[in-house]
Amino acid sequence: MKKNVLMFAAFLIVSLAAFAQGQKRFNLYAVGFYNQENLFDTCHDEGKNDYEYLPAKGWNGMKYTNKLRNMAKALADMGTDKLPKVGCAFIGLSEVENHKVLDDLIEQAPLKARNMKYCHIEGPDRRGIDCAFLYNPSLFSVKNVKLVPYVQEKAKDSAYYTRGFLTVRGEMAGEDVAVIVCHWPSRFSGPFYRESG
């Protein structure tokens, strides 16, 4: 996963450098992606199959708080090897349950210190997991956010809904930037859904 993040960061750096070449100006921005691995709160969301992450199944407030603390530290550390004071300009997130977990996440000290904000649109996934976009508003300004549904070409089950693609348009370093945050269907979904994604 680190290799993918580094490759994406390198691509963004090269892209921004190419735009700036005419002016001989180069800016370095770290960006990333992090799978939150089922960041669920401890409350049931109506209409969602989130029962595995409720107190009856052993998921409790202490585990949730520890996960928030650990995730916030990991996210805040991303990009600090090159940009120790600012870290990532933005980070795509997957497997977040709802606005509440994102509110709780950005209230954690390491992210709150950077005034991190987020974009999230509730999707149709049966389990309730979505993608989100975490960003530093002093480095990236959001212009437009949209959820594009994931459509299977030959889906056998028309009732099968999964997370879509969160698209974010914004501005960074005076340039228009478009980001797509996605989390492809997992092995649990079977080969048809993975391969058609």
Residue ranges and their predicted role:
Residues 96-185:
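Structured beta-strand-rich core segments of catalytic domains in phosphoester-bond hydrolases
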Residues 2-3, 67, 163, 187, ...:
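Basic side chains
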Residues 37-40, 140, 185-188:
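Short loop/turn segments at secondary-structure transitions that flank enzyme active sites
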